[in-house]
Amino acid sequence: QLMDDAWQALLQASGGETVGVSLVNPSQADRREVLTVSDRPVLVQVPAMAAKSLTDAVFDPEHPVHVQRGRDAIRMTNGLVDVCIDTRDGLVNSIVDLVSDRELLLSGQRANRLVLHPDYPDCFDAWELQQQYRHSGDPVDRVTDLRVTESLLRAQVRVERHAGQSSFVQTITLDADSRAVEFSVDVDWAERARVLKVDFPLDVAARSSRDEIQFGHIERPIEANTSWDDAHFESCGQQWMLLAEPRYAVALVNQSSYGHDVSPAGGDEHTPTMGVMARLTLLRSPQSPDPHPDQGCHHLVYSLLTDARVESAHVEAARLNQPLQVRSGTVELPSTARIEPVHGTAVIDAVKQAFDGSGDLVIRIHEAEGARSRVRLLLDRDGCVSEVDLLEDPIDEPTQQLPASTCSRVELTLRPFQILTLRVSQR
């Protein structure tokens, strides 16, 4: 209701038309993606923190999707990414980055495999996960139905499964002009004392994972060389996990599945694979204090982003977590604020009115790479920009050299993971 009221206020304030359709981008990233409008896919482009009429936002794809159907395999490709699904088990047996010309899955391995593990913590069922669950697991491989839908903008493979007391519907999606493969699973969950994981055996020689946290990311080792490392068998990240080797990386981006683990994948001392097994924790079913937690239907979404960087991982995370909004009425609103990188990466975390009711605009950003960065902040209005603290009070020793006169563009120099709050005043 709050968003509906805000949209109606925007329509009235901007003199927009009540007919037609507009797209609203609530995120800090420019978006170019396939969106379903009136039950049909369209490729749209909307600037960061802006609104655009649907008519002006639609584009033709540069890399349309094509599907090849074989006896035992279905291949989806858009000229950027090639995905192959084995029709016998509905699992992904190949993901090729066509731009970098490399296979992303370990040889002979399958991705997007659901596995049910026993889950019996010694105590505190709902809060603890113990690594004994790794010693056994039941793959959810049996296919009850498999269907394919395709167009030049989007191809999907839908796989239905049943295991234990639960049913699963997995969907694998490849969109035009996209370097990400999207996965979703609809679960009717009825398990007891089990944990559901999904596997991605990746041919990436990563020594550590970078997991997003608020205002940055944390780097965690993959090899368990110490008892401390061994105790980190399950980690928490927010929207993405980046796995990198020199000159290449992939990212697992999620919508709500924050728990994950990464370990060296397979092989032995004579034939090491140099890859990693990355797994997301999707659902659990502890028995205490609530004997029936999470029972029922769930819709979970995650994606694999090829040739990833911290910046592109943030953009993909915005696509999953801050979807474009389809609104009735036609209005054009420019970007309230956006970041233009010079070198490095910064992310806008908040754009809001000042607490004191002055009408000033407060913008909070952070440096996301963990390195020194230079960026430009572009505003939709002229204003006097000053640096404030988290409570929006002036600071005695500002970190930025900001112009004294009003402007709509400022240069910023950020320290690693620096959080910067700016106030834009019209006076």
Residues covered by each model-derived region:
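C-terminal (or distal) subdomains of carbohydrate-active enzymes
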Residues: 12, 17-427
